[in-house]
C-alpha cells in the first residue's frame, strides 16, 4: 500500500480538477461577526462528499495507517521556524530519533548556536510522563537534568507545540483534524503540486487555501510536501491571512524533515538519558 500513496495524490488531480479549481459556493451569504472575521454555514452531506478536501483527507488517513503498519521508528534532521506571538522566530534545527510504540522521542539541538547541545527525551508511560531535558554551559552543569511537564509553560516556552506532537505521524494527524473540520464548510480551494524538491529530493504536494478569513477555519493556506521515494510527508507550511488587504500571508509555522532514515531498530537505550553517547549530566 505504501507504494500507492503518492499515486493517490497524483491521480486525484484529474478526478478533482474541476472541484479544486475554485471554492464551493456557500449555501448563503456569510454573516460578518463582531470581530470582523466572517462566519459561513454548514454544508450539506451531499456537498461534503464532493468537497475538495476529500481526496486529501482520504490520503492522510491511508498514510497514517501505512505509518502505523510499516514505520516503527525513524531519525531525521528537522529544520523549523514558528511565529510566537507577533514574532516569526529564526530557523532552528534539531536531530531527532522517534519510535512510535511506545511513543519515544530524543532531541538534540543543532542550531541556534546558543542552544547547541541541549537534549530532551520523552517516553510515553515513563518518567511520570515528564520530559527529561538539560541545557548547556554553566547552567546545565549546575541545574543538571530536569523533569518537565511537556505541556507546561517552561517546556512550551518558544514553541507552538509540545514534544509529544513532534514528528511525521503528527503531520498526518493534524491534516486529518483540519480536513474533518473543513469538510463541514464550503470555500476550501485545493491544488495538487508536482515537480517539488526538498533538500534535492523529489516531492509531490498539496495546497489548501481559505480565501476569506472565517471563524470556522484555522488557517489561510497550508502546503504539505510528500517525499516521492519515502512516501512520507516531509514539509509542512501553515499561513494566516494577510494583516492588510492585498498583503502577503503570514507564515505561522514551517517544518522540514531532512535526512530521514526509517526503521533503524531503536531500543530503549536510544531514549535513556544514561546513554553514554548523550550529554545528560
List where the protein language model places each region.
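N-terminal secretory signal peptides that target proteins for export/translocation
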Residues: 1-6
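Bacterial N-terminal signal peptides
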Residues: 8-20
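Short secondary-structure junctions and interdomain/linker hinges
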Residues: 16, 70-74, 182
Amino acid at each position: 500500500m505504501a507504494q500507492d500513496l503518492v499515486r493517490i495524490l497524483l491521480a486525484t488531480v484529474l478526478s478533482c480538477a474541476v472541484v479544486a479549481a475554485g471554492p464551493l459556493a456557500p449555501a448563503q451569504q456569510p454573516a460578518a461577526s463582531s470581530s470582523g472575521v466572517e462566519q459561513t454555514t454548514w454544508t450539506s452531506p451531499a456537498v461534503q462528499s464532493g468537497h475538495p478536501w476529500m481526496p486529501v483527507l482520504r490520503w492522510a488517513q491511508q498514510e497514517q495507517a501505512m505509518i502505523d503498519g510499516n514505520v516503527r521508528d525513524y531519525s531525521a534532521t528537522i529544520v523549523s521556524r514558528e511565529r510566537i506571538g507577533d514574532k516569526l522566530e529564526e530557523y532552528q534545527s534539531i536531530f531527532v530519533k522517534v519510535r512510535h510504540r511506545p511513543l519515544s522521542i530524543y532531541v538534540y539541538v543543532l542550531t541556534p548556536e546558543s542552544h547547541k547541545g541541549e537534549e530532551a527525551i520523552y517516553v510515553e508511560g515513563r518518567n511520570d510522563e515528564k520530559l527529561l531535558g538539560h541545557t548547556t554551559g554553566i547552567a546545565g552543569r549546575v541545574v543538571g537534568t530536569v523533569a518537565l511537564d511537556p505541556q507546561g509553560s517552561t517546556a512550551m516556552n518558544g514553541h507552538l507545540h509540545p514534544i509529544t506532537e513532534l514528528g511525521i505521524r503528527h503531520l498526518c494527524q493534524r491534516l486529518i483534524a483540519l480536513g474533518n473540520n473543513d469538510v463541514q464548510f464550503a470555500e476550501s480551494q485545493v491544488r495538487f503540486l508536482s515537480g517539488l524538491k526538498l533538500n534535492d529530493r523529489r516531492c509531490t504536494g498539496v495546497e489548501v487555501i481559505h480565501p476569506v478569513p472565517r471563524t470556522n477555519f484555522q488557517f489561510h493556506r497550508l502546503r504539505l510536501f510528500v517525499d516521492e521515494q519515502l512516501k512520507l510527508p516531509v514539509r509542512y507550511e501553515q499561513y494566516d491571512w494577510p494583516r492588510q488587504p492585498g498583503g502577503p500571508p503570514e507564515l505561522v509555522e514551517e517544518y522540514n524533515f531532512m535526512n530521514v532514515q526509517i526503521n533503524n531498530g531503536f531500543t530503549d537505550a536510544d531514549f535513556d538519558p544514561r546513554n553514554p553517547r548523550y550529554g545528560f549530566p
